[in-house]
């Protein structure tokens, strides 16, 4: 079979895996209130808002997912070199990473909540721990598995020269950064502040004054993930999937059109710059259109 067709198929699969990975990663962080929105959850009891959110801020998402995917990639790489089937090796590595993820989540939740119990009266709800840890580990496993699969395809079918553990680390950092900057805005700036007028941002005076009641009953992290699965999660997945797909596409296009290594590299760089320029123009047009249509925010 034509090597170019194999590369295109692998790239399509890697892009699809990255899309699923980004969505699962963002929804996992919504269940556990990690990264940007976590500072608001952490401030809630200090503002008198006793909540039932899962508060786990182990670290920023780029660092934590860099760790999880690197663990999965390292174990998978070792098992593959030992002769195990690649898919099984990735599953085993992702399972170990999920256990690490769960251990950090439990210790972070108990540590942060207990630290606020005496001074601010925030109880440790054990049912929140038991009901949220499953979705956290489950979404985390899906995210880590698909990221490790994309990293494996990059190192085998797409010609990435770096070893699987390093590529997995980079992919984990990347998807964590995208989830933190793209999907978490839907949770931290909207879901947690639905009692305030939409579009006003989060003034300093309102920080920590989070919503603690849902449409029915008291709100928790599972409600947040359900809400964000409609927009924030898919948007994160689309962003990460496009990054993986377009980055691989420019390299394949350089291999198709170019002859020697310098020509291939130059074409790939030019295509990458063109993609960035087109994305910047589209973003600008979209922002101007939205501002002209809806106007400035007024309280």
UniProtKB/Swiss-Prot annotation:
CC terms in the record's Gene Ontology section:
cytoplasm; plasma membrane; vesicle membrane
Report any Pfam family annotated for this entry.
MtrE
> What pathway does the UniProt record associate with this protein?
One-carbon metabolism; methanogenesis from CO(2); methyl-coenzyme M from 5,10-methylene-5,6,7,8-tetrahydromethanopterin: step 2/2
GO function terms (MF aspect): tetrahydromethanopterin S-methyltransferase activity
Its BP terms in the Gene Ontology are:
methanogenesis, from carbon dioxide; methylation; one-carbon metabolic process
Per its UniProt record, what HAMAP family does this chain match?
Answer: MtrE
Q: Which NCBIfam families match?
A: mtrE
Protein role: Part of a complex that catalyzes the formation of methyl-coenzyme M and tetrahydromethanopterin from coenzyme M and methyl-tetrahydromethanopterin. This is an energy-conserving, sodium-ion translocating step.
Q: Which family does it belong to?
A: Belongs to the MtrE family.
Protein name as it appears in the record: Tetrahydromethanopterin S-methyltransferase subunit E
Underlying gene: mtrE
